[in-house]
A protein has these predicted regions:
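Conserved lysine of the Walker
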Residues: 110
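P-loop NTPase motor-domain active sites and their immediate coupling elements
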Residues: 1, 13, 23, 44-79, ...
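N-terminal anchoring/assembly modules that precede and organize ATP-driven motor systems
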Residues: 1-7
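Hydrophobic positions on the alpha1 helix immediately C-terminal to the Walker A/P-loop
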Residues: 113, 117
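Residues at the beta-strand->loop junction immediately N-terminal to the Walker
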Residues: 38, 103
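A short interface-forming secondary-structure element
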Residues: 7-16, 21
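The conserved Walker
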Residues: 41, 106-107, 246
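Conserved beta-strand position immediately N-terminal to the Walker
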Residues: 100
Length: 331
């Protein structure tokens, strides 16, 4: 939608490092803003050269959400991410990630991505299946989800309350582990599938989302880093998943401990290759075009995948949130 990828099979005698060094020369020859060279494309014997299109195409949320693969999937935590360079719909499962770090400069599409995650899950899961803890220190990004039945508490807008929510999540994690031990099951899926389980004892998944991790780290520092790392290390088996978003991916915010325990990452357009290395451990995000253009680094792939993120409009967010606010609470 945003770039066209050309596949080139170089002569066997040509070193890939020589091809990678031609990016600036190719960009100048094509009068392109930036060019990304993927050498080689994982699992293939070709080099990919990605050139920005003059007219970019928006990826609608509905077109990806209604794709057959997403409709047929059973996971409550699957969300629409966007389309890859070949135009194929791309959806990912937060349950398998199991935690996600999102970083990008202002206007790069980070906030839209956060909204697409929440909206996708709201359209797939009931409040008995997935609950949210939303931390929005900017006060405007996650406010539209106020009072939906999936929330465990109101949208949190103060750093001290966020610290308390993280401490609660660590306590909840430990309680859930005790329940797993008592039922001799290894994870939340096995526990919830137990034949003798009372429906009221079912454990919902919990998604703890922090929008503007930098503000929280600046105000609370180690007091929030510790519970975040604890949750990232252990919470997967009991169905608690973190989504951390930030505009300022400095090493003070995305610390080594957080990075080591959050292997799945999304980088939108960055100001410099230093920021790109902080998030992805490699350059590349500084050459992205913006407006939803991202590099997604899954935990199980050696290189990031370039994706054009879905666009979720404010009207779509409001429609989904209003629908859930109007539902009668389940007994």
């Amino acid at each position: 939608p945003v770039v066209t990828q050309y596949e080139v099979r170089p002569d066997a005698r040509i070193k890939l490092s020589r091809i990678e060094g031609l990016a600036d020369d190719l960009a100048m020859a094509l009068a392109a803003r930036s060019i990304r060279i993927e050498a080689p494309i994982p699992g293939r014997d070709v080099v990919g050269i990605e050139i920005p299109n003059h007219a970019s195409e928006m990826v609608g949320f509905r077109s990806v959400f209604e794709d057959a693969n997403m409709v047929d999937a059973t996971s409550d935590l699957l969300f629409a991410l966007g389309r890859d360079v070949s135009g194929k719909p791309y959806a990912v499962d937060l349950g398998r990630m199991p935690h996600l770090l999102i970083a990008g400069a202002t206007g790069s599409g980070k906030s839209v991505c956060v909204n697409s995650i929440v909206t996708s899950i709201l359209m797939r899961a009931k409040p008995t299946e997935v609950r949210f803890v939303l931390v929005d220190l900017k006060r405007v990004e996650l406010a539209p989800y106020g009072r939906i039945p999936h929330l465990l508490t109101d949208v949190i807008m103060e750093a001290q309350e966020a610290r308390a929510a993280l401490a609660w999540a660590v306590g909840e994690m430990e309680e859930r582990y005790k329940k797993l031990a008592k039922s001799t099951t290894r994870n939340i899926a096995a526990y919830n599938a137990g034949p003798d389980l009372d429906p009221t004892e079912r454990m919902p998944y919990i998604v703890l989302m922090i929008d503007e991790l930098a503000d929280l780290m600046i105000q609370e520092g180690r007091k929030v880093e510790e519970p975040i790392v604890k949750l990232a290390q252990k919470a997967r088996a009991v169905g608690i998943h973190l989504v951390l978003a930030t505009q300022r991916p400095s090493v003070n915010v995305v610390t080594g401990l957080i990075k080591a325990n959050v292997p799945s990452r999304i980088a939108f357009a960055m100001a410099s290759n230093v920021d790109s290395r902080t998030v992805l451990d490699q350059p590349g995000a500084e050459d992205l075009i913006g407006r939803g253009d991202m590099l997604y680094q899954p935990a199980d792939l050696p290189r990031p995948v370039r994706i054009q993120g879905v666009f979720v409009s404010d009207a779509e967010v409001k429609a989904v949130a209003d629908f859930w606010r109007e539902q009668e609470p389940e007994p």
